[in-house]
Amino acid sequence: MLDAMVKKALFLLISLLAATHQPMKAENKVKNPETEWSDENERSLPSVPQLSIDEQNLYIRSSVELTNLDVCIRDSRGNIVYSDSHYIPAGGMTVIPVASFNEGEYTLFINEGSKYVIATISIN
């Protein structure tokens, strides 16, 4: 009889834990940035855009005005999942929604003229 009660209690405990368990979610990350943002003939751009990401959005910040910033995101198969041009005022940012992206690795290409940033972003 004690065995049956222990089994019942254990079953209830496991059921309760399974019902309330929230899956752990790792933070999305920007990894492996590669930049070529300084050209010998274009010294007027003093800083590379800063990238950050959370579970909903990718943020691109810049301390200088970027007037025609092309942003392209490709999935692991090379398919374009996002492509658009952006304007970022000095000290401003642009926001790109990533909440609808499937889990996985994506390659981010950002360029303005001959200057570029390539980074890997991880969506978890």
How does the language model describe each region?
Residues 87-111:
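Short, surface-exposed loop/turn motifs with a glycine/proline- and acidic-biased composition
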Residues 75-80, 106:
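Short, glycine-anchored, charge-dense loop/turn motifs used at functional sites
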